[in-house]
């Protein structure tokens, strides 16, 4: 490796290296590699007994190689003449290509005259390899000349940054900044071009990050230097200027390293084979390792390896469980899942020992493998929920510590500023810690990179914000100090938003909503207790947390809906968020203010506790409704077992009384009572549910054909199916519906969806010219109306527990059976309606011509089939599947092609 120091430019280049680092060199080299390879492979079966003679094909190919070489020579001459850098090396490389081209021309001609000669073939292969090496070296040299040009511009910017930092007065500072700005812009354009051409994704990311830091921090360095010149006595300004200058130096080094495709100091900061989180990668890897061929199983080899891997995973899980933000119940669940995973591994190893030496895995072994993967999946889910506990708590009212710090600085209270600076620093560290926790359990490789980059920038910004506050505290009347503080405040808030969005991208909205719902429930109960205990501060603080959580839920859900095509689903979700933000939260805020005012007055004024409790309950209900609306399009397979927790949460205060008689029976929900049915009655219900599942599978098969974007009939069918599944789950003592009122509410939702489907169906029928199709569709729509009505009646399931002669008897089975039957009938009607709607739409299209292919809101497009590998992979590999953002085109690797020619030397 040689380093060229021209004008203090550290240019690293190994003249012997043939490593191709950019896509441009690959693209230019590819045609020549293809032509040479084709020529070399001509008649490659070796000597034959056929009549010797001239090969026209070989001559044609040799001529094309010669022409391609001439083209390279023309371009090489032009580059060598125009290049300001590495001129001598480029001229020498062009001459080498010319020399090797002549040798190749001679060897190819001889081979074309006698293509059956192995000696002449060997000579041509060696000449081809030498030619490709020479051309590759020429292209790499030309590429490095471009890099050298970029490094020269980088040096100009680096010197300009130093001059800006060391400016002796404000006039000089202004001149230096004015001169630096266009140079930075010029460098940014050159670096962006280089970034696009880099082959290595890591180098591209490094270049992008460094460019961003440079663009953002040059104006901030100007402001910081200006503040230093105006207030030389304030140490905080000097500290800030030095911090920003250090960041800019790192950015310059980052651009230099990325441009030359060399490793930077921080390249190995985040190991992990998958590029995702360490814990997620370890779990994915463990899931792969547990699949072993019984023939090759050896306890001495596999047991220590698997146990060691698992203990490493459990150590990571334990760290998360012991973190301060992890709830006690979540900690207990993580510990329980860790123990369950340990036990499942021991059971699996025992089964492997029993199957050792066999060709096929036994059913018991397959069952143990399934159990093992289920347990690791359960552990994953609890870890995700633990991370969401942290995210929900930490990314809440993120600007409060900053505002408190700035307020203290404006008052000129340096002692308070130092105290609040510590709080602010802890808050920043918590955000960074939680962001890294979220990364550890995520498989989203690109998302994890973005989170870590954002967290790193936030970490660098934290001391700068504190220094700006200390400077403002020293000169609270200074306009420059206030502007400087505003600048850093804006930068901090922007960076926190970027980090928040990045964390949201790598976490599941389903997990976020489940955890937020539980946290709001906790806070609502705390609010009610604070009200009863007349704790004004506690009430105000907890109510603020509720408002913050609700606002965050609304923001996250609204952002998520931007990813969907507008339709029935998005309307329902946005309707629920609008209800919470426009109606529920204002009422809750009003009640909180009234309560705080009543409790703060002397003497304390009486207030309506029930009104406050109702307003609090509505907040929880609003969050739950949003969550249910978001989950509406999820299939049962996509829903976690814990998406609807089995506990019966009571939002009301401990002293409040339930008024709905049918809601709680002897302290139990109706759903819990249904779960206590005798086995005989459960078997009857199971039989009905199995019949219902058959109809559901028919509906799944029908709707899975169609793309639901722009087709509200398919969206409504999925919604109705989901609600009916919840209702049938209720009859088995499972699912999200707990009480009769929940089932009635679900039936009303189905009726609403049915009426919307009826309206859409009738629109299609009105435009259908075929009377038979029209009559069929209208008949099925009438069935939907009928079965919706039946379902509404059957939804009033009265589950009761009676004590007859000392024996507990659970009633309500007949109602449950009727409910399932009505749901089954409705499901069948929906299937037939979807089919009839499609048929009627096609008749309409044929009669109206291509101009009106689709009716408004009903677009019948076949769903694109899922991409599947040609070779079936193991299920465990599916966790590692990545979605590529662009199609991958296979490029010929010239260096690989060269190495392959070496094998031909022996021919």
UniProtKB/Swiss-Prot annotation:
The modification N-acetylthreonine is found at residue 2. It is found in: Cytoplasm, Cytoskeleton; Cell junction, Adherens junction; Cell membrane; Cell junction. There is a cross-link at residues 57, 798 (Glycyl lysine isopeptide (Lys-Gly) (interchain with G-Cter in SUMO2)). Monomer and homodimer; the monomer preferentially binds to CTNNB1 and the homodimer to actin. Component of an cadherin:catenin adhesion complex composed of at least of CDH26, beta-catenin/CTNNB1, alpha-catenin/CTNNA1 and p120 catenin/CTNND1. Possible component of an E-cadherin/ catenin adhesion complex together with E-cadherin/CDH1 and beta-catenin/CTNNB1 or gamma-catenin/JUP; the complex is located to adherens junctions. The stable association of CTNNA1 is controversial as CTNNA1 was shown not to bind to F-actin when assembled in the complex. Residues 865-881 have a biased composition (Basic and acidic residues). The modification Phosphoserine is found at residues 264, 268, 296, 298, 642, 653, 656, 852. Belongs to the vinculin/alpha-catenin family. Residues 865-895 are annotated as: Disordered. Residues 97-148 are annotated as: Interaction with JUP and CTNNB1. This is Catenin alpha-1. GO terms for biological process: cell migration; cell-cell adhesion; negative regulation of protein localization to nucleus. Residues 2-228 are annotated as: Involved in homodimerization. It is a peripheral membrane protein. The modification Phosphothreonine is found at residues 635, 646, 659. It comes from the Eukaryota. Keywords: Acetylation, Cell adhesion, Cell junction, Cell membrane, Cytoplasm, Cytoskeleton, Isopeptide bond, Membrane, Nucleus, Phosphoprotein, Ubl conjugation. The gene is CTNNA1. Associates with the cytoplasmic domain of a variety of cadherins. The association of catenins to cadherins produces a complex which is linked to the actin filament network, and which seems to be of primary importance for cadherins cell-adhesion properties. Can associate with both E- and N-cadherins. Originally believed to be a stable component of E-cadherin/catenin adhesion complexes and to mediate the linkage of cadherins to the actin cytoskeleton at adherens junctions.
